[in-house]
């Protein structure tokens, strides 16, 4: 497949593979503490070595998220953040934000708008992919062609508890990359990641040509290096970044996010 045919996410992974580098993929919650800050942070992460960004759409009942990201979602909702406003903010960054943005949304907001309409709006705003953590594989099989029509990659998740045959199906149906959840349970920092993940990276890479990114529980440079040593293609860092941003002084959030991103970038190379 020529690079013209590849999605923005696939192109980025191809480039990194050629450079023998790990994709650094920070996660942040849109609208925490407000959307103006989110747009500053997105540009700061891009300038600090992020290869792509996962942007959370705040939702009132985030089942897959731990306390840090739940608190960020609550702050964003309290500030009046809505899916429509997130997409408006993203649209306003066109031309400035050139790294792929993957929207992380629960299925309820997506189904409220309608799968097709959501995909159209997300693509029009400049998103490159979607992650819907609570969407069953069977529903994902309905959403995937609608996303693909709009040039969006629907990224599917695999956990250490996923049965082997189902894991193969997910790996083969995921687009852009497969999101490997490194621990069972909700998102959050972990001092020790489950060593079983190393074997899962290998299994996924054997059964599918799609890159594998590890997320949930990566808290710093040491774990980014660990993920790299396992042969994964990307590392997703969420709670640790969100926590750093929440602790930063007013006006310092984008700078603090960029500083943390540079630390992780050094570990990823």
Swiss-Prot record:
Residues annotated as catalytic: 54 (proton acceptor), 65 (proton acceptor)
Molecular function GO terms recorded: tryptophan synthase activity
InterPro entries: Aldolase_TIM (IPR013785), RibuloseP-bd_barrel (IPR011060), Trp_synthase_alpha_AS (IPR018204), Trp_synthase_suA (IPR002028)
GO cellular component: cytosol
Pfam families: Trp_syntA
Superkingdom field: Bacteria
Keywords, ordered alphabetically: Amino-acid biosynthesis, Aromatic amino acid biosynthesis, Lyase, Tryptophan biosynthesis
Reactions the enzyme catalyzes: (1S,2R)-1-C-(indol-3-yl)glycerol 3-phosphate + L-serine = D-glyceraldehyde 3-phosphate + L-tryptophan + H2O
Top-level enzyme category: lyase
Pathway annotation: Amino-acid biosynthesis; L-tryptophan biosynthesis; L-tryptophan from chorismate: step 5/5
PROSITE patterns the UniProt entry points to: TRP_SYNTHASE_ALPHA (PS00167)
EC number: 4.2.1.20
Function in brief: The alpha subunit is responsible for the aldol cleavage of indoleglycerol phosphate to indole and glyceraldehyde 3-phosphate.
Family according to the record: Belongs to the TrpA family.
Self-association and partners: Tetramer of two alpha and two beta chains.
Protein name per UniProt: Tryptophan synthase alpha chain
Species whose genome carries this gene: Parasynechococcus marenigrum (strain WH8102)
Lineage: Bacteria, Bacillati, Cyanobacteriota, Cyanophyceae, Synechococcales
Recorded name of the encoding gene: trpA
């Amino acid at each position: 497949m020529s690079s013209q045919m590849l999605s923005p996410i696939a192109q980025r992974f191809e480039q990194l593979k050629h450079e023998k580098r790990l994709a650094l993929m920070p996660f942040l919650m849109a609208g925490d503490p407000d959307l103006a800050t989110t747009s500053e942070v997105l540009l700061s992460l891009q300038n600090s070595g992020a290869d792509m960004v996962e942007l959370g759409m705040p939702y009132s009942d985030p089942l897959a998220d731990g306390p840090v990201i739940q608190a960020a979602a609550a702050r964003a909702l309290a500030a009046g953040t809505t899916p429509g406003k997130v997409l408006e903010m993203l649209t306003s960054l066109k031309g400035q934000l050139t790294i792929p943005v993957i929207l992380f949304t629960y299925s309820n907001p997506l189904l409220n708008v309608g799968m097709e309409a959501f995909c159209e709006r997300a693509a029009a705003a400049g998103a490159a992919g979607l992650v819907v953590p609570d969407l069953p594989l069977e529903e994902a099989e309905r959403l995937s062609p609608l996303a693909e029509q709009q040039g969006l990659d629907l990224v599917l998740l695999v956990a250490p508890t996923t049965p082997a045959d189902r894991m193969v199906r997910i790996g083969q149906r995921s687009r852009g990359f497969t999101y490997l959840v490194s621990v069972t349970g909700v998102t959050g920092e972990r001092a020790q990641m489950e060593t079983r993940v190393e074997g899962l990276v290998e299994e996924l890479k054997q059964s599918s040509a799609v890159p594998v990114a590890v997320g949930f529980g990566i808290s710093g440079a040491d774990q980014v290096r660990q993920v790299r040593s396992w042969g994964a293609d990307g590392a997703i860092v969420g709670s640790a970044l969100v926590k750093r941003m929440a602790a930063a002084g007013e006006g310092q959030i984008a700078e603090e996010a960029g500083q943390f991103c540079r630390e992780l970038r050094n570990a990823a190379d």
